[in-house]
């Protein structure tokens, strides 16, 4: 079943319905991303995330004017660099972000992607096919051939230092066969046999067993004690580097061969095809072989084989344009719906969830699945007692497929849509044009809880140690009722919480105190204004410089800011018009929470590149593209991925393609790498 089948066809949506769905999808994906990357506790399977992400991409393509600047499709989630995370692992900033791959679920979608890629590349491409290993991404840095650092993907911008743990994985070389300085990336996974042995041992010891090999690998790699990691028998495959020039190769298939020569573990199942029509045979082959492989796979990765073309195609801020992942169709099982519950999110959206008899799907025990919204529930007509098909979209998120009507109990009744909020009992509102049912009571306990969790999260105020369980305890003990109460907490109050010793209390108070000094874009994100995420908050902070300026700005002024728009401006204005918000802002100011925009460096506005729209193309010698882009942005430039009439400057390396041709047609100034060095007087 194609994951897209759950959604209303885009062509049948009204503009207002599309707008509402885009907003709700963005909220859901942001929440799920936080759970996955920050809290290591996802509430939905990967398949559900992938399906909703693909839906958001399609909606934004159909309605580009509705795409929000802070959309999950427009950025890799980012956070501030801090010394350690809640586990005690040191944070590592990735100089080149570790991007996710775009997902497709059918051969036709692969063929469609091939058409776009061929058009952008200017010619038919050969592709390197690789198995998509079901593990977690790893970055390995070598200097003069010696392993000096290993880090997890994290949120794509910041990962965790797991060097000592990785050194216990025998397959990963500590010293390369050549003294190269290079960063490579790959996958850490747990073989099926090792996973079975580990779970048997844990079961015998009375410990909780792991749901699947990926979770086991992730938990094993992120141990504070390398001795524990060593006992888990992890494995690895290496498949990528951004430094192909170091290897002296021209194709992705050659990259894999050079990795073998250097001593890296490389999966031997890759295959080069001349055209995308050949991909079906490869997919069919490994669909059959999948269950008999000694490791888990959840799809096939397709990569442009020509590295020069890869470089030319580049990346969006979220995904590479030169590669895509085909996800295997989800596994299905039959189960019985025993209950339908309703939960309230941060923005007041009330979501139905099916509670079912537990079943195993793709190695995971599943007993809950979101029913998304009242319209979806009524369209599916899911009733308590129904037998339903359950699958994992993209092998990740549990989803109810079909109701088996012939098995429906005679007394099964259509499930009523609630009239009152399950948390605060306020009357629910179904806003015209929206699919969501909302609680609009600002004092709703569920919304307050979710708002506090969001306020403390990594992308917001980044209060380490203030997770969902702590927030729940603080609320249940009446130690806090609203956001500003966090800044009045004392160590003695925190010691009354379960599992909170003096040190834990001291650490949390220190984390709360540190958050007072955050630059104001974090506070803007943390306030939870509908549609305003981290990226939009940064734009607003840079423009207004102070929270009070934003609070007092009119909707028209806000809407004129590049990348904001009228919908977000109206939401911001509506938010600050609230008396309770005005009171909250005053309280935060009284608690000395910083309201100012703190720039990381002073930009010399006289430098040649300041305020210019710049595009990079071609192969560079002295710089990598990410390094040059970072330098330009630090010095006030706006770096774009495509040439347009608004482009001020094209910086061209060697082996350039269509961007140079387009720049020349538009009369845009073009300089080379040496010109850049001369103008900037910059050293890498």
Swiss-Prot record:
It catalyses: NAD(+) + (deoxyribonucleotide)n-3'-hydroxyl + 5'-phospho-(deoxyribonucleotide)m = (deoxyribonucleotide)n+m + AMP + beta-nicotinamide D-nucleotide. It comes from Oenococcus oeni (strain ATCC BAA-331 / PSU-1). Coiled coil: none annotated. Belongs to the NAD-dependent DNA ligase family. LigA subfamily. Its EC number is 6.5.1.2. One of its GO terms (biological process) is DNA repair. SMART domains: BRCT, HhH1, LIGANc. It is an enzyme of class 6 (ligase). This is DNA ligase.
